[in-house]
């Protein structure tokens, strides 16, 4: 059995639906034989471990623990879904206060127990803010921490595929940037539909401007729609895409979608947000975005919204004033 690496991968929040799906996905993708499951809810965690044992996977060393020190010690890769789940009627931002405190503790635990970790993926919402908090308190480099942002882009591809009645693979380079929330910037200028630029189609009978606005709304409310349909928040899609991210960080195939990353350039400062990124063994790197004037204006609005959330966390006392960040994590300017 060949694996991408033999390094230890720890799944935080493994008793939950996202965490347990991440664990199974990581095994099925043959990322590493050394998988550790962590969750403070011991009975549920044991149940997940038992189910994975019952799958009969070959070559796996699956361990589980409710001791965070044991879980993180020696881990080279960590994916955390260890926050509260979003429920009906809630926005991602409604989760801010409780999950901000969880992110602070998580970051400090990473620093204490696995300072040599290679990459951390944070996916509990609001992921842009929980990822930022984790980065600050972990002491890691910005290139070592990413957040889940890709679902908005995959949802855009799905909506366009349904609208045009063609296979998703014929919809190329769908992108949303900025925040992973309803204030995200949905880009049309990057995408192609069966080889034709989406911008050339919008405003024609094939896709009227009104229909495009409706699609954008469906994308921004995609997570809420899953809750309405299933009675619970998404778990299959975030689990799969997050493991794709950590696989890329292990040296696997390139990650195809935007990721949330720490940004301190191009007019966006001291924030974690979705950018055009590349995730490799060397970490995550992003490049400047070029969109239409309308798209760039929307991106600035999304950034401003994230700054408001960040400043709320500063007011809560979970994050210190920005001027003090470098003293906590010298890797952050």
Can you name each region flagged by the protein language model?
Residues 23-24, 107:
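Generic hydrophobic/aromatic pocket-lining and core-packing "Φ" positions
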Residues 55-119:
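Rossmann-like NAD(P)-binding element
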Residues 28-34, 139-142:
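Conserved S-adenosyl-L-methionine
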Residues 91-159:
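Rossmann-like NAD(P)(H) cofactor-binding subdomain of soluble oxidoreductases
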Residues 15:
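Conserved glycine-rich cofactor-binding loop
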Residues 138-143, 153-333:
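C-terminal substrate-binding/catalytic lobe of Rossmann-fold NAD(P)-dependent dehydrogenases
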Residues 6, 31-75, 84, 311, ...:
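Conserved N-terminal Rossmann-fold NAD(P) cofactor-binding segment
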Residues 19-20:
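N-terminal Rossmann-fold NAD(P) dinucleotide-binding loop
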